[in-house]
Amino acid sequence: MKNKWLSVLFKRIAAFFISIWVLSAIVFFLSRITPIDPLQSYYGERVEKMSEEQKDSARERLGLNDPIPVQYVRWLKLALSGDFGISYKYKQDVTIVIKERIQNTLILGVLSYVILFIGALLLGLLCAWNENKFADRLIVRLGTITSCIPEFWMALILIFVFSVLLGWLPASGAYSIGGGSLLDRLRHLVLPLIASVAGHLWYFAYMVRNILCEETRSEYIVLARAKGTKDSTILFRHCLKNVLPAYISLMAVSVAHILGGTYLVEAVFGYPGIGMLTYESAKTSDYNMLMVLCLLTGVVMIAANTIAELVNARLNPYMAQEEK
């Protein structure tokens, strides 16, 4: 069994690196066929005053006149050595700009994921504990409504209510000008966190509820009830233990979906993270920055799916047996 699981591990790791290479090639070629002139991103308004000779010289210096396959091979060699180039817009090393932004995305993303993981589990337990009762029906209806609201609409509603009408919370940014205290950063995190979590919370809670309700109808649960075992003991000691592996696998597979929602929330709230930086790079055709951001996002998504498959193979031996 151990050898079979190691075989699954080896195959998944090999598939991971192949997927990253294919992703880098696709993103590179797509970024090079956009209609936006990268010189506009690099020189700004000054490009309009440049002559054609100056533009050709600038393109030659940036390596934009070479065939796209040649550009890709050159970029790949530099990337493997840790050199991802200079950002056209920020005139800094790409990795330096990303390091300044990635901590904000990590804070927002990790907090959203933890709150979602715990909140959905507790909400699903509450619904299963009160199956078909008032609390269960109320949560189901409220959850159905919130899950139908797109994240950008949820973000706009939150901004309008809590920032425009009530003035309780800031509408954008990661901290106030001249601020930066822990309390100030937390106030700026509240609305993006709610927008990130609200759209996903009920989906996962509903999955937990349904799995738990189905589990409570199993034969061993019926037998336990016949022996006089308390419902709380059945739910928390027996049912939850059997549901957790499936729930962990579901949350691992959903990292990509949650990450995409976090990027969208960053763009709406003007939160200075990787999502906002990706939007700005795409808008200005900042090739080097866009390449690294898309590759970084792809690595996270592919890694999350790979880890989820490995977790499934570890928790479910039958899956490992099917891998040949």
Which sequence ranges carry the predicted segments?
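Membrane-interfacial helix-loop-helix junctions in multi-pass membrane proteins
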Residues: R59-P67, G85-Y88, V94, S176-L189, ...
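Alpha-helical membrane-inserting segments
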Residues: V22, I26, L30, G119, ...
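Hydrophobic alpha-helical transmembrane segments of membrane transport/permease proteins
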Residues: I20-V73, L166-D184
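Membrane-water interface segments at transmembrane-helix boundaries in multipass membrane proteins
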Residues: V140-W202
